[in-house]
């Protein structure tokens, strides 16, 4: 791959500095090479050495198993079964020149019994959790440079240890639950999830939790049990285990009856009667708590 480069302001070509790919024939080692049992002949046409290497790797059986194992680990389980690795690798190799090669491999993996039975076996990494929360909360804001809330988010998110493109080794961030199950990883991810539910951009909430609740649960039905049930369905797709749901209901109800007391659509201080105390703030905190449950943090 000598000669494969980028236009990066090199001293020989200072005017070329836009980051695009460039092949420089004069930099290329045109001598013979030997790779994985294959002889690469000398003085080949431009870029053919590199393309021959890529073709050799793309068709190699160990490469097929390596990539398929990573895909299965990503989508199914931290400990992929060898039978599925082998069957996926067979499809990978049989279609190594097909334009839809990865699509065929993924269709095989996602239609497998291993995938069908994999619910809850994977943990969401911090990035997955943050993006899933934004999607589920109906956010409509875009991270962008020179924007205070975007900068706040990226600063806070950086403490999770999962900042995009920040892993120094070429193997990418770990994709196993153990790597992201430490107290720091969870705590920093929870901070991000809490921030997403509470933060405003000026006077506009980043995520319209109160408005979403109004649009989907009639205010006359705002009992603690109804609110928890609706938001669990929205964020999880199902109801969490009974003890966990009861804790969420108790938090939302405070000193009110969870089944009969209708929580007012207000946000005022009522310190002597907690069932009426900062109801909107409590609703947003309820949503944050659901996002922090094991049910949301798994997939």
What residue ranges belong to the model's regions?
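Non-catalytic, conformational "gating/processing" segments within enzyme and secreted inhibitor domains
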Residues: 1-81
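Flexible, low-complexity segments enriched for small/polar residues
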Residues: 60-64, 68-96, 107-299
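Short coil/turn linker and secondary-structure boundary residues
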Residues: 4, 45-48, 100, 222, ...
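Acidic/polar loop patches that form or flank catalytic/metal-binding clefts of enzymes
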Residues: 9, 100-102, 116-119
């Amino acid at each position: 791959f000598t000669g494969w480069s980028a236009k990066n302001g090199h001293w020989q070509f200072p005017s070329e500095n836009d980051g695009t790919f460039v092949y420089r024939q004069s930099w290329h080692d045109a001598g013979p090479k030997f790779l994985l049992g294959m002889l690469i002949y000398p003085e080949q046409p431009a870029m053919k050495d590199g393309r021959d290497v890529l073709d050799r790797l793309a068709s190699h059986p160990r490469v097929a198993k390596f990539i398929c194992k990573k895909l299965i680990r990503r989508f199914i389980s931290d400990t992929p079964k060898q039978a599925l690795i082998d069957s996926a690798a067979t499809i990978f190799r049989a279609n190594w020149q097909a334009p839809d090669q990865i699509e065929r491999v993924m269709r095989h993996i996602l239609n497998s019994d291993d995938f069908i039975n994999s619910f809850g076996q994977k943990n969401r990494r911090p990035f997955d959790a943050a993006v899933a929360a934004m999607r589920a909360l109906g956010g409509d804001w875009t991270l962008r440079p020179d924007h205070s809330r975007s900068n706040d988010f990226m600063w806070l998110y950086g403490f999770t240890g999962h900042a995009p493109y920040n892993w120094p080794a070429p193997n990418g961030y770990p994709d196993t639950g153990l790597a992201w199950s430490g107290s720091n990883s969870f705590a920093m991810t929870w901070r991000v999830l809490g921030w997403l539910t509470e933060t405003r951009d000026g006077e506009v909430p980043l995520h319209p939790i109160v408005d979403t609740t109004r649009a989907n649960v009639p205010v006359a039905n705002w009992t603690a049990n109804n609110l928890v049930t609706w938001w669990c369905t929205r964020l999880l797709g199902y109801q969490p285990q009974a003890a966990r749901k009861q804790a969420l209901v108790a938090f939302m109800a405070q000193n009110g009856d969870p089944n009969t007391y209708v929580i007012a659509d207000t946000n005022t201080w009522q310190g002597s009667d907690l069932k009426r105390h900062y109801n909107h703030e409590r609703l947003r905190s309820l949503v944050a708590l659901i996002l922090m449950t094991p049910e949301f943090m798994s997939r």
